[in-house]
Amino acid sequence: MFEEAMGAPVAVDLFCCEGGMSAGLRSAGFLVYGVDITYQPRYPFPFYQADALSFISYKASELRARCSLITASPPCQLYSKTHRINRSIYPDLIGPVRAALESLGIPYVIENVEDARTELRNPVTLCGAMFGIETYRHRLFETGNGLTLSQPMHPPHRARNAKMGRKAEPGEFMHIVGNFPGVDRARHIMGMPWASRNGLCEAVPVPYGMWIGNQAMSQIHGMEGK
């Protein structure tokens, strides 16, 4: 699986979608491989179409031997406000994914939305205002197997959010959700010029991934040196 690695630290991004987290990790110096149950033709790095839990199971030995970091973004619909409104049935994957990652022993990050806070262990919150991008986009990140993330200072939200479904005016922050207008601007904000509208809606902004990757890289070097 990792023939192209050639000594570079490897990260595997589960539930990768179109690769926002992956691109951030790549910018931090990892060689990244994406895994998603749905084919992702826009994903910009080596890609494996597979169920995440099955992938962990049948690639466990190879992952332990070669992988330095695993990130996972289980579907968030179960925890979203939309789910509470329409009562659709979605799988609860945070617990099973955590158990599988803990069994591997590889440093990991699990990402999800704010409404999943009670399901995550001591998560760090990231916001676009921390990175100077024009979307607030709060996301939570749990870490484990020796990896930790520091909680950045959370700046006040001074810019106004554009109303849902309306194009953001100059100085307004974007809601990158649903059938939003302004795909090109959203691509710029998220750092994903290759992404589709749906991919942007589901993505972790690239600056978040790079920040996580930089912290992980320094810690992983320390772990592997022991």
Which role fits each region the language model picked out?
Residues 9-10, 86:
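A generic structural signal for short
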Residues 1-8, 220-226:
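Short intrinsically disordered terminal tails
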Residues 3-9, 32, 184:
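N-terminal cationic amphipathic segment used for targeting or macromolecule association
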Residues 11-58, 71:
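SAM cofactor-binding core of SAM-dependent methyltransferases
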Residues 51-69, 76-224:
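Class I S-adenosyl-L-methionine
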Residues 6, 27-29, 42-44, 64-65, ...:
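Short, well-ordered coil/turn elements that cap or connect secondary structure elements
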